[in-house]
Amino acid sequence: MTASQDFVVKDISLADWGRRELDIAETEMPGLMAAREEFGKSQPLKGARISGSLHMTIQTAVLIETLKVLGAEVRWASCNIFSTQDHAAAAIAATGTPVFAVKGETLEEYWTYTDQIFQWPDGEPSNMILDDGGDATMYILIGARAEAGEDVLSNPQSEEEEVLFAQIKKRMAATPGFFTKQRAAIKGVTEETTTGVNRLYQLQKKGLLPFPAINVNDSVTKSKFDNKYGCKESLVDGIRRGTDVMMAGKVAVVCGYGDVGKGSAQSLAGAGARVKVTEVDPICALQAAMDGFEVVTLDDAASTADIVVTTTGNKDVITIDHMRKMKDMCIVGNIGHFDNEIQVAALRNLKWTNVKPQVDLIEFPDGKRLILLSEGRLLNLGNATGHPSFVMSASFTNQVLGQIELFTRTDAYKNEVYVLPKHLDEKVARLHLDKLGAKLTVLSEEQAAYIGVTPQGPFKSEHYRY
């Protein structure tokens, strides 16, 4: 990167390829295209300076260009070291949008690129964050706490934190007061995924959330579609591209049966695998059992599994002891946001053989081997290309609406976490029906009055479970 080249991508010559795929993706993303049509003239994001941290895929490229059509300035990095599609990053960089994303980043590069999305040429700060997993938000908040004199950088708990804290110290030395100034300038953040939302709620509970946040993840048109139907298609895609293994007849264990776990279990079952589920929540466990899956503990199931996938958003779900029990050539992977669901660090002293990018063969002293996908990070994005465009259109339309809401109506929100209102959730769904040839039935005035709604909706209460 130079002063005249405000981007970092693998190969800018891939831009034409990326643009061709972008053109196809736009035809599969009716929500984002409708947002351009509705808001393009009014420019509701004019003046917005958005720092985006979200997987730099073809679908994300359509989101970025939608934000720009609506008036925003954007700087972008990927939220995962393996999830970037290099041709997508090149296509965006070629349009003049600063993007810092390469498939296969080091942790040092990852946090440098996260820092770069806040470094505008005029030296002024960002005023919005669009986040996936919370790393961009946490970078600013931890840095501001360090500038205030809190001892938050002296005791890293992981290799990732070591690198993060080093980057914060580097920025503090280069630009004193940077984090405090940046934190004060943020009008709000929209957060894409379960893990990042959990971080925001923890901050709110502690009284440490300094600006409003919109929880995009818990919009119905995100969690019940992206998390479920997206994983239903992309999990098996990632395993197949990574291993070429036949899944029919294999024993697959899915750790967790939330929305991501449900989609993952259906994905593997659809491929012919014999699926078992682990759960800590009795309600989700009962759902899994009544959906026809055997509910087990990983302690009991590890020795018979051919494939084990984590979907929980928790840490240490697959331990080194579990992996010692697994059979030779068991496939181990994760489709939750962070890599700490699997105790990958405990494997580092074993023999690793890289088979191909994001596929490693790990050999134990007794000769047993495991196939680890994407080093325990998101395998559907590391080993494949993530969710299909159509389902991401719904998620990203929520992101756009959330950005508009927080940027244009900042004073209407306290420093708390919010979910988009039901009428906007229904609007997002409505925008995607025509593409599937679906036709809505219209309530009569009498029918609407009978159930206490209007013919135009919203049709369900806020607490309704879809």
UniProtKB/Swiss-Prot annotation:
Keywords associated with the record: Cytoplasm, Hydrolase, NAD, One-carbon metabolism
Reactions this protein catalyses: S-adenosyl-L-homocysteine + H2O = L-homocysteine + adenosine
UniProt-annotated binding residues for substrate: T57, D132, E192, K222, D226
Enzyme class: hydrolase
GO biological process: L-homocysteine biosynthetic process; one-carbon metabolic process; S-adenosylmethionine cycle
A GO molecular function held by the record: adenosylhomocysteinase activity
Cell compartments where the protein resides: Cytoplasm
Cofactors: NAD(+)
UniProt family annotation: Belongs to the adenosylhomocysteinase family.
Cited function: May play a key role in the regulation of the intracellular concentration of adenosylhomocysteine.
NCBIfam families (alphabetical): ahcY, PRK05476.2-3
Protein name (database record): Adenosylhomocysteinase
Protein source organism: Brucella melitensis biotype 2 (strain ATCC 23457)
